[in-house]
Amino acid sequence: YLYAIDVDKKPRNNTRKAVCKNSTHANSYAIHVDQKPRNDTRKAACKSPKNAHRYAMLVDSKPRGDTRKAACKSPYYAYRYAILIDQKSRKDTRKAVCKSPYYAYWYAKEVDMCPHEETRKAACKDSLYAYLYTKEIDKCFREDTWMTVKGTEYEEKYKRILKKLVKEQII
């Protein structure tokens, strides 16, 4: 892509074809040389979750099914896609983030902004995120989160937060 910038000083089919063999180079070509979306550079960018996300943000400037599908191969990029590009929750991005307790918790907190069975189930794969899910999202006792934190370093914190939540409800 540097050849297109430094020598050709314009987009050409032969340089574009060459850069489309690498998702990062295709992304950079679309941003710096074509300066617009094209099906061939988008297809090449979608070989990588990172570059699909980057293409949607910087080239398409909007959500698309193909870039979202590629981003959803990574919980991290699925989360980023939902929060920065879609700017809303969707079944496909939620499913992708649920491969990670960390991103499931953050998706529930920052994207769904409410409890969801799928994100809670994923958060319950790790005692820290089960505890945080109870504290920040559910804000009530649930058997599944309790069973995850029971017998761990978060058990006492879980009990304390539940006592606090009960006191707040009474007052």
What are these regions (language model features)?
Residues 1-171:
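Ankyrin repeat (ANK) tandem alpha-helical domains that serve as protein-protein interaction scaffolds
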